[in-house]
Amino acid sequence: MLALMALALAGAWWGWRRRRNSYSDWAQHFSFWDGQEELTRRFDCLYVGTSEAGLPLQRVAVGPLSYRAKAELGLHPTGLVLRARGSKAIVLPAAGLRAGRATWTIDRTVEPDGLLMVQWILGPHVVESYFRLVDTDLGQMVDAINALSKERQA
């Protein structure tokens, strides 16, 4: 029984390591937030995960997108700032941002439309990040992100 558990843990470790290695070149496309400018709004949330657009079970495992964490989202004219606990803050560029609602992703299912889904561009890749908001009106957040994207495109 112990050998079976050790084999399962080794398989999980090997799979996670392989996934992280397959996304290692994506890290060069991150824009890190320097924190010099003030955010227009801040929201506490739980960062759930990021997947490739259209592939909701394909977790993107690179840098601050690798693990679920308590986080803060901030609105800024240049984009949406994601500050996950224990990681450097990154900017999801306003150009190409699109927000909506979701019920499930990777390993999380909630009540209907209970997750915030943000589609954004990471270098040449289109990805979708999912968040569980804390004490925030989800509809207002979706509208604010979509307005930010429209302002940037205008």
Where are these regions (language model features)?
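Acidic, Ser/Thr- and proline-rich intrinsically disordered linker/docking segments
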Residues: R18, G96-A154
